[in-house]
Amino acid sequence: MNLNASSVARVMLGDATLCEDDLYLGLGECVLRIRSNSPALIRELTGYFSHVAIDAKEAAMEVIAIEGDVPQTGVEFTDWKREPGKTGRKDAYAELADGRLVHKVRTGMIFLQSEEYRIAAGPCLQYNNQVINFINSQHMNWLQHRGWLICHASGLVHAGQCLGIAGFSGGGKSTLMLHMLDDDAVSYMTNDRLFVRVESGQTMACGIPKLPRINPGTIVYNPRLQGMISAEKREQLLKLAPQELWELEEKYDVHIDQVYGAGRIVAQAPISNFLILNWKRDSDDETSIEQVDLGARRDLLAALMKSPGPFYQYPDGSFQQDDASFDEDAYLRELQDVTIYEARGKIDFDKLIGLCQKTIFV
């Protein structure tokens, strides 16, 4: 079956009527328009993206989200290969003549990615986080088309300079970042997708409007976040073994402006330092940070390199493949003027924050 994006779009849109309400997002020079058949979904997305919502009439791209049953496309999907260390089925895809269809295995959601159509269809209200990720994927594509390199990292801004934070799986970069935000002099840039690019001899960092999405283990020990759950829920969680609590997968969105105050989000800034968390929960060594040469420690690149994923469409219309290898030299080139630090020893957030204040935030 040789389907094209237009024929699949007709199936996904069905007889849905798009509501009058829409949402425009101002992401630097990139403007996105979001439309849906569900006013409730537009309201939810407007609340989530409130810090980048703008009044506009024109957009570089349009994303349509159709709330309803999962459309029956009749397409046969192929599983997208997971990254090392990840298990279970997550994404599947089907190539079209001029686009790609992506199926979220756990939720059933369907997404059409092409140069003309960007459509999400299925129970969008129930799985609005996947719609949010799809919207952010369009911004990520736009950035990468303009030479920005994707990093699996958080980003904070202090004194006008970005600090990137990367870590191996379960390293606690989101927890560390949120603790650092307790300092009013620190601003939020991004949770786990940071983009870097050298401009006129200066290395710049850019984030995407994705709020931190955290597990209960991050909430229970952070007084600033404890209001996100009930006192009863916190008591139940504190009864769990530390390792069980750490591994518990329940997701909560942290609305930065509500928790930390207005004006605490920065979209773009020069980046001068990058911290890679290579510490261990079961280590007996004291927490420490050391400046390292990334070229001589290519093993650390695995913590910060990130595949663009199944939604990435190159400027020539072709798509990212799941067996594409990373270009390590591209990361070394873009980060050559950024000071790289490695955190070692046992996981101790308070100790590491103190070390960062003495070593990096000076």
Label every PLM stretch briefly.
Residues 180:
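Aromatic pocket-lining residues of Rossmann-like dinucleotide-binding sites
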Residues 176-177:
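Post-Walker A alpha-helix
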Residues 1-166, 183-189, 194-362:
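A noncatalytic interaction/capping subdomain that flanks phosphate/NTP-handling catalytic cores
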Residues 173:
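Conserved lysine of the Walker
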Residues 169-170:
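Walker A (P-loop) phosphate-binding loop of P-loop NTPases
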